[in-house]
Amino acid sequence: MTLRKWQRVVLIVLDGVGVGGQPDASAYGDQGASTLPHVAERCGGLKLPTLEKLGLGRIVPIAGVDAVAEPSALYGRMLERSKGKDTTTGHWELAGLVQGEPFASYPKGFPDEIIDAFAGLAGVRPLGNIAASGTEILKQLGMEHLQTGRPIVYTSVDSVFQIAAHEEVMSCEALYALCEGMRKVLDRYRVGRVIARPFVGTSAENFERTSGRRDFAMPPQGDTLLNDMQNAGMTVLGVGKISDIFAGQGISRALKSTDNADGMRKTREALAQIERGLVFTNLVDFDMLYGHRLDALGFGRALEEFDAWLGGFLADFRDSDLLIITADHGCDPTTPGTDHTRESVPLLVWSPALVCGQDLGVRESFSDAAATIADLFDLEIRTGQSFMDRLL
């Protein structure tokens, strides 16, 4: 297949679906983490026939998933070169932007100068200002929030400033405006994301976060593959929280999603809407609903639901289309703690035109995905090593 024939690429990020600790995992406290294999083991095996045919079982041993003799996709693993294990860092590297300096994190709470700035915008000082699980902090502070109207601020070991507010106390629009204000404040502190966390409910027993979550990311500190594709006249559609992660930069149009099912549906719609360009999708439920909440069984069900959808989605592809399935970090629900884990990520690359699968080995950077897409469309490779020659 010649270079000019490639027309559409779909890049799907299974948020949090790592496949084993990186060599430096112990430096992040993540020795022994291996999200996908551990989820499969905890579930007593997974039924992933479509991913199995593509070659998933040849990347790492996964209970219930065979290492087929003749996989239909290129397969391998990618290591993260950037410092960190957060969503923004992982996605930026997938788009060709490697960070030498990690985002700042505040696991012991934010300093007074940041909280003072928040109070100036909100009109009140926040509750919380601690590192906590999103569901647990609602149990702890949700009722006080209802009584006082003070927003809840919390963080984690990742570079996030999260603001939770009940939808009857603060409208989503007001919460988003507050987050936008804090985004401007926090750029100079290198906080990766400000996250709006609206919730509903009447007591600690039934408080529940809604699908109104919004991420306000620090803008990428340089151009990415997305900018290059746009500048070359191609369409870049961001499904799920992709546009938020890139602060809208390089995104032709955003298709927000409420959950994995909606994200998968919109990915299929997006592919039908473009003739030349990229559909970049994030499916967040693996991480948000199951990894952080230590729900391995729910994680496994979500993977099986994705696999069932994927089988039908592949029928939409033309010979000139390419599919890349990967992840941005790990989020192992079987290890202590509720945070992300520093892991390698799976790499599956498929097209109807691909004659047979091959082993891509262990790639040295997530940016190899961006390098390959750039190579397919005859764009400059900013960083990473293209594996386009393996597609010909």
From Swiss-Prot:
Q: Which GO terms describe its molecular function?
A: magnesium ion binding; manganese ion binding; phosphopentomutase activity
Q: What class of enzyme is it?
A: isomerase
UniProt-annotated location(s):
Cytoplasm
Q: In which pathway does it act?
A: Carbohydrate degradation; 2-deoxy-D-ribose 1-phosphate degradation; D-glyceraldehyde 3-phosphate and acetaldehyde from 2-deoxy-alpha-D-ribose 1-phosphate: step 1/2
Recorded superkingdom:
Bacteria
Q: Which cysteines are joined by disulfide bonds?
A: none
Q: What Gene3D superfamilies does the record point to?
A: Alkaline Phosphatase, subunit A, Phosphopentomutase
Give the binding site residues for Mn(2+) 2. D287, H292, H340
Matching HAMAP family? Phosphopentomut
Q: What is this protein called?
A: Phosphopentomutase
Source organism per UniProt:
Syntrophotalea carbinolica (strain DSM 2380 / NBRC 103641 / GraBd1) (Pelobacter carbinolicus)
